[in-house]
């Protein structure tokens, strides 16, 4: 018997597991492959517009993503630095090896937390309340609370060209039966889609034909509780290239060969992260589109071709990649593909992320219809906190829209619902001038302390900052300035 079972070891599952275990509750994290804990199956980055502020909020509440990004990144920069403070946020290139390794260490070193390799095929529900799970190896495990964080693995299909087969990211085994179990208990599901671009061999790129994109020249960090110590001059650069008329012609001449336009895909994809086919078809007035060449690992030789998600067959992916500057001789190491998966109708959730239909059942991440590691981690943290608070017979943590981007995210999911994978944007937050990068700790650390995830050491750091701000404010209020008219002085 565990107090909490978390199903899925992605970013939502990791934050949920850590939150429950650190609050003292016996927690079982079940994942199909322990090697894929906190995996980044798509872009090798943490943060971005609005998302970077969410990572700061996760950190302020006691989550792990922010600190892990700080100690795992290849480069980091402040986006929108020339614009107003309401839209500034951090984005880093994360090392796809180091980030998961650090997360696994944190999980293994956390008391009350057990990790098990298996897949869940059925929920045990009695009188509309969770009792436990049955795994695909037919093991029954009891629990008081269950948090589902299956990401894109639920009844997943991989699609490329005219080919379609069951599979999760990286060819991993999908979760084939849990979706049926959820529907059997009255949970409404929907079909969504996302995709990933090809990867190319670093040594096969002609970087002289590309534009270099460096990290910022000042020390930056997601975490509010640690000083950054990385070497600014050793940040790994990204590079920028563009599609062109040849690229566009190849796509337009072969739309019938890609999964997206051949009718093979039924799931709805993310509006704000479209495939390259969608970009060319929907924005025919554009002569070119930005393509980012992003390193996946410090010591690896694979480059992520950002902005080039595709469902074209392999031979056409070769032609498309070779049509762009810097990539004429590029060697593709992994081909792009789309993935379709089942997701819960988020209108069936409470603001606590607990199911309205099944007591003790929570869900977080892409199963709730979101896209992005940051949105997933934020939901996982809140679901973990609220499952724990429920075990303690306490009221759930409900963040308001004027308190946090996390509050905007959850409120949108629960009260507006989604028809496509949801992505956080600054434009979604009507209080964005209050929900800034620089004040995430001032907004949320007291809440993190109250729910039991901010320890004494972190709280001391926070209180010292608050006292210093107060002293500075008092100093400014008590300081007078005499303005001398320059003309009178002459």
Report the location of each language-model feature.
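Core beta-strand elements of the Rossmann-like FAD/NAD(P) dinucleotide-binding domain
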Residues: 136-145
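Mobile, glycine/GP-rich and aromatic-enriched active-site lid/loop segments adjacent to catalytic centers
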Residues: 71-105, 190-359, 363, 367, ...
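Beta1/beta-strand and adjacent pyrophosphate-binding region of the FAD-binding site
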Residues: 1-12
